[in-house]
Amino acid sequence: MCAASKSENTQLGQRPPTRRQQRREKRRNVRRIHLTLYKTEGQSFHILFREKIMAGLAGYVEDGRLSAEGIECACAGLLTFRGILQTLAIDRISVFATASLRNISNTEQALSVIHAATGYFVEVISGEEEALFGYAGAMQELRLSGAFLDIGGASTEIVKFDGGTPVNFASFPIGSLSLYRRCVKKILPGEGSLKRLRQEISQTIDLSEDAIVLHPLLIGVGGTARAALKLAQHYCKISDDCHSITVEQLDALCTFLCSGKKAASDLILRLEAERIHTLVPGMLILQHVFHLFGAQQLVISKYGVREGYLWPCKTAWT
């Protein structure tokens, strides 16, 4: 779930006060509730701090419904962040949710309970909006042509763009955590689980021939892409100043992580312990899309859907 906010004395479409303004945005995916505090001035912004709560909400989805306990868990996280925002006197707040509330059957019930408990109206953005917001966020840092990829816990967004302009986009109901829950029996996938993972990915992320155009460059955002870079920097001896991965490095890393060797699990535990169960499924999605577009290089952006959600709102206020 995510959020951004506006001053109480400023209406959408009007020019905001000239003083520096603080904005906060919160996002919850299947596992986490995120808080990000921004400071904006004119057409620029920078992140003051980020915070997250490990909510474990995926464990509360039963038969496609988020249980009462899961909704209560979400409310508790939001109330924790509301206390922080009240202490800091932040007056511009918006909350939005992605696949976490989009892909359940009782979305309206969850939204109603969350509003009653927290006072927040949560905007559930569509898969297409999530794809375009993620792309817009990445474009705040990068001005490139190629394909954009955001692997979340429950969905994967792909945007093809040219010269900073999106050409087309798609959202797929498959993510690192949902894939893990569907295909993996233990913490790390064995040979049978790897076969199920690859089959599920190829069947779900299946673009038409007309939609597939070879792109040498792939831009990645989100936790899976950042974790891939972090592990590649260690395993492939990439400089910490480098924010890209080649197809050869990605394939070598995937082969190592899927090898079943203790050194592979040790590497994940040392660098990305909280992703011990979801990293391999996410990496296999990344590898599939990489080869689908014939990409030669992955560039990781520090901005994503939250900054993309922030940007159009901020533009409307100026």
Where are these regions (language model features)?
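Helical "lid/coupling" subdomains associated with nucleotide-phosphate turnover
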Residues: 37, 58-88, 100-145, 160-163, ...
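N-terminal glycine/serine-rich phosphate-binding loop of ATP-dependent small-molecule kinases
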Residues: 1-23, 31-97, 111-117
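Gly/Thr-rich phosphate-binding beta-strand-loop-beta motif of the actin/hexokinase/Hsp70
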Residues: 11-45, 138-172, 223-227
